[in-house]
Design a protein with these regions (language model features):
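Catalytic domains that recognize anionic headgroups
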Residues: 1-291
Length: 291
């Protein structure tokens, strides 16, 4: 299975007609914006190469805007704004990891796209399995627990911890469609409520990240794979989610938390990994709105 993020150029006219029928003008323009951002941004913009930064632990929040941490982050460090190399998780992983030999690094990820990365990139990969009946819900506590296990098993490796929050579904809402907050905001125009809910969802992962910083030794960098549009306008129409070629999506935070102690890091050849089934990954990606 390989991720499919868009359609061929020759398919666009037919898809546009289909979108107009099913989603109206607003929904169609939203899809056009995402198509452009997902398929062209990463080809024309470099963005940061986070693997070349000096860190022992890299914490990635999924869909965390730069202004989210600037206004509400509780990390005791300066927050920079940097440009992500992509506006979508899979493009981000391709740009940051694919073709690399990061054999001094272990990846712990709740994002299902990590399941598609080649076996020879990292020393080890821990794909976090949803621990909830709703396959789109990934509890950040579970990610932290897996990360601590990974650190115990591989103490001399750099560690990447990829939380799914503040990406939808918002954990405070049970048994609701992942995009329900966006749908409601489109209908009511209440963007302040949406942002407040977004912050609340972020807190779940931030609390875990703060615990990780206390628990593990080494220099920690906190960032995001991409940001999130929360009603900002493109062509006069409010956009929601990610994929869009907009500052709210491609600008991400970068926070460096220093440490007095650093672990000794050295590379070793990759070890066998357990892959999740294609059916489960497809179900997760669809539930998260990626497909």
């Amino acid at each position: 299975m390989s991720p499919s993020l868009g359609v061929q150029v020759t398919e666009v006219p037919g898809r546009l007609v289909q979108h107009l029928r099913n989603n109206g003008v607003y929904g169609t323009i939203d899809q056009i914006s995402k198509y452009i951002g997902i398929n062209y941004y990463h080809r024309l913009v470099d963005g940061i190469d986070i693997t070349k930064y000096d860190w022992d632990v890299l914490i990635i929040f999924d869909a965390a805007r730069a202004d989210l941490l600037e206004m509400f982050g509780r990390f005791d460090a300066e927050i920079e704004r940097v440009r992500s190399p992509a506006t979508h998780s899979w493009r981000y992983m391709q740009r940051q990891y694919s073709g690399r030999r990061l054999h001094d690094t272990v990846l712990v990820s709740a994002n299902p796209y990590a399941n598609e990365l080649a076996d020879d990139i990292f020393h080890a990969v821990y794909q976090v399995i949803p621990d909830h009946e709703e396959v789109a819900r990934s509890e950040p506590q579970t990610v932290t627990e897996q990360a601590l296990v990974a650190n115990q098993e591989h103490p001399n490796k750099r560690l990447i911890i990829h939380y799914m929050q503040p990406h939808t579904p918002y954990l405070q809402f049970k048994n609701k469609a992942p995009d329900e907050p966006f749908t409601r905001a489109r209908q009511t125009g209440d963007l302040d409520q949406l942002y407040s809910e977004y912050v609340e969802n972020y807190r779940y992962a931030e609390n875990e990240a703060l615990d990780v910083i206390e628990e593990l030794e080494g220099r920690v960098i906190i960032t995001a794979d991409h940001g999130e549009a929360l009603g900002e306008r493109w062509l006069g129409i409010p956009m929601f989610g990610h994929g869009h070629w907009m500052p709210e999506v491609y600008e991400v935070p970068l926070v460096t938390v220093e440490s007095d102690t650093r672990p000794g890091i050295f590379p070793e050849k990759p070890i066998a990994r357990i892959r999740l089934s294609d059916d489960l990954i497809n179900e997760q990606l669809e539930a998260l709105g990626y497909r």
